[in-house]
A protein has these predicted regions:
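Glycan-recognition and catalytic cores of secretory/periplasmic carbohydrate-active enzymes
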Residues: 1-216
Length: 216
């Protein structure tokens, strides 16, 4: 309840600061962020609202787990805190979130090894299937849990729990405590793998890892 109230107050503060965000029938992201051709979301726009032509690393149409699930969470949060209904966006937000989840589960979930891909192209072809636990698997679990709480779609909690099960199986350091961070596609550690735990408290997990318990 406290987190919901803080979320509501924060969004209302944004509304007061920039009323344009909430004016009209739909927000910028409802109008422009939905990939109507392939599903998921397009998120790289310039200051004029046009899809960018190039990026330093990927292409503007490539889809990363972080931004795809952030969009799912955003639409879900608007539904759950009542702002979507207040501004007449409820059905649009439901559809925007659902189609994002459809694309995300179909294209990002690693059906062979479990876990999630890092990035796909616009059509959903996997470009990088490595596992980066803190920035991807854990955050997307919380975002899918938000989607479930907003819509009741059982897939949200199903895949959040599947992810958590994979993390317990592959990422948990059962000797020292904490979690390993950086994995290859098959869950073998990359050479730059990191153990996320507080050195001053042996075995204490990183805060992001612990927060998954609150969502599930």
């Amino acid at each position: 309840m406290i987190m919901e109230q803080l979320m509501r107050e924060k969004l209302l503060t944004v509304k007061k600061r920039d009323g344009r965000l909430y004016e009209g029938k739909r927000s910028f992201w409802l109008e422009n962020g939905i990939d109507k051709e392939y599903g998921g979301y397009l998120v790289c726009f310039d200051s004029k609202g046009k899809l960018m032509k190039e990026l330093a690393v990927l292409t503007p149409e490539d889809k990363m787990i972080v931004t795809q699930t952030r969009m799912i969470w955003g639409f879900s949060a608007l539904l759950r805190n009542g702002l979507a209904k207040r501004y007449g966006w409820e059905e649009k937000c439901k559809e925007a979130a659902k189609q994002g989840v459809d694309f995300f589960i179909d294209k990002f979930w690693d059906k062979k090894n479990t876990g999630w891909a890092w990035v796909t192209d616009r059509k959903g072809n996997v470009l990088d299937n490595g596992k980066l636990v803190l920035r991807t698997d854990l955050l997307q679990s919380m975002r899918l849990a938000e989607y479930y709480m907003a819509t009741g779609d059982e897939r949200g909690i199903e895949y959040a729990e599947k992810t958590f099960d994979a993390l317990k199986k592959y990422a948990a350091d059962t000797f020292y405590g904490g979690y390993f961070e950086n994995f290859k596609e098959d869950w073998t550690l990359e050479s730059a793998g990191v153990l996320w735990r507080r050195p001053e408290i042996p075995g204490y997990p990183h805060a992001h890892h612990g927060s998954i318990y609150n969502s599930l």
